C-alpha cells in the first residue's frame, strides 16, 4: 500500500504555491464526468497540469482534463480540479485523495464535490440533481489506512456529518431561488470500472442508497479528516442497472452531464457565493 509523508504533501503544495503569485484558494471544487465546463468560467485562471506537481498522479478517465485551475469564481478564490482520479484507473485511495490534502495546505477550507452517477431510487429520473446527505462505502480499504498523518487530523475521525449540514441548507436555498428541482439522498461508492449489476443495485437500495457511483467518497473522507467543510452533488445521468430494461453506456453518461451543465453550473456558482 503506497503511503505519502507529510513532507511529500508539503513539496506538492510548495510547487503549486510558487506558481500562484500569492493567490490563496478558499474553496476546492472537484468536478465529475461531463461537468468540467465550470472550470472554464474561472476568471484570471492559473492552470497547472497535474503532471507538473510532484507526487501527483494523472487522470486517464474520459472527459477529465487532468489540471488545476486557480482563480476567481462567483466572487470567491477557488481551485477547480478539472478531472479527478479514480481507483479503477489503478490508483490507490491515497493517490485519489492526495490533492485534497495538498490543497488544504494551500488554504482551502471547503470542498465542493460533484459526480455523475446512476440513480437507484426509483422515484428519481435521469437528469435529476441530488444533494448528498451521506454516503455508504463498504468496499476496499479506507483512504485513511496506514500511518496516520497527524498534521491533518486524528487517527479515528468522526464521520457522522461528513456533508456539512449548514452547506446543505445553502444548497437548498440556492436551488429554490434558481427554481432547480433538487433531490436529496445517500450516495453509495462502488470501485468500478464495471457498472453495478442489477443484484448490486437492489442491494444498494435495501441498504438505503439513492445513487451509486465510482468517486467522491475517498475525497470526502479525507476532507472531513482534514477538518474541511464538504458539500456534495450527484448528477443522476442514468438509472442504475436493472431499474430500466436497457444497458448502460459511458458515452451517455458524459452526454447527460454536458446537457445538465447549465443547471449544475448555476447551482454551484450560487452556492459558492454563500459558503
Model-flagged regions — what are they?
Residues 109-110, 210, 229:
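Short acidic/polar active-site loop segments enriched in Thr and Asp
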Residues 214-252:
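Zn-dependent metallopeptidase/amidohydrolase metal-coordination segment
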Residues 15, 19-22, 166, 170-181, ...:
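Generic non-transmembrane alpha-helical segments
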Residues 136, 140, 146-193:
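Histidine/lysine/aspartate-rich catalytic loop segments that bind and position anionic ligands
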Residues 104-107, 205, 224:
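Non-catalytic positions within long, well-ordered alpha-helices that form the structural scaffold/packing
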Residues 174-210, 268, 275:
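Active-site/ligand-binding-proximal alpha/beta "capping" segment
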Residues 1-159:
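Metabolite-binding pocket within alpha/beta catalytic cores that recognizes anionic/polar moieties
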Residues 240-275:
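His/Asp/Glu-rich mid-to-C-terminal helical/loop segments that flank catalytic regions of hydrolases
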Amino acid at each position: 500500500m503506497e503511503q505519502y509523508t507529510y513532507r511529500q504533501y508539503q513539496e506538492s503544495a510548495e510547487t503549486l504555491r510558487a506558481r500562484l503569485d500569492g493567490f490563496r484558494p478558499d474553496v476546492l471544487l472537484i468536478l465529475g464526468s461531463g461537468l468540467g465546463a465550470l472550470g472554464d468560467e474561472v476568471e484570471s485562471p492559473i492552470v497547472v497540469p497535474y503532471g507538473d506537481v510532484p507526487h501527483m498522479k494523472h487522470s486517464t478517465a474520459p472527459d477529465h482534463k487532468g489540471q488545476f485551475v486557480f482563480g476567481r469564481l462567483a466572487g470567491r478564490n477557488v481551485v477547480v480540479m478539472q478531472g479527478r482520479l479514480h481507483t479503477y484507473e489503478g490508483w490507490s485511495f491515497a493517490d485519489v485523495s492526495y490533492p485534497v490534502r495538498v490543497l488544504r495546505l494551500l488554504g482551502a477550507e471547503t470542498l465542493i464535490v460533484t459526480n455523475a452517477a446512476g440513480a437507484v431510487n426509483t422515484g428519481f429520473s435521469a437528469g435529476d440533481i441530488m444533494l448528498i446527505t451521506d454516503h455508504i462505502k463498504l468496499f476496499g480499504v479506507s483512504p485513511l489506512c496506514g500511518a496516520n498523518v497527524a498534521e491533518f487530523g486524528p487517527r479515528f475521525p468522526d464521520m457522522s456529518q461528513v456533508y456539512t449540514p449548514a452547506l446543505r441548507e445553502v444548497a437548498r436555498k440556492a436551488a429554490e431561488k434558481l427554481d432547480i428541482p433538487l433531490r436529496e439522498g445517500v450516495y453509495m461508492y462502488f470501485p468500478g470500472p464495471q457498472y453495478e449489476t442489477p443484484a448490486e443495485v437492489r442491494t444498494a437500495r435495501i441498504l438505503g442508497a439513492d445513487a451509486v457511483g465510482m468517486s467522491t467518497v475517498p475525497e470526502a473522507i479525507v476532507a472531513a479528516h482534514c477538518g474541511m467543510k464538504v458539500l456534495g452533488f450527484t448528477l443522476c445521468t442514468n438509472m442504475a442497472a436493472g431499474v430500466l430494461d436497457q444497458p448502460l453506456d459511458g458515452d451517455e453518461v458524459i452526454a447527460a452531464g454536458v446537457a445538465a451543465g447549465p443547471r449544475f453550473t448555476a447551482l454551484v456558482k450560487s452556492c459558492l457565493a454563500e459558503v
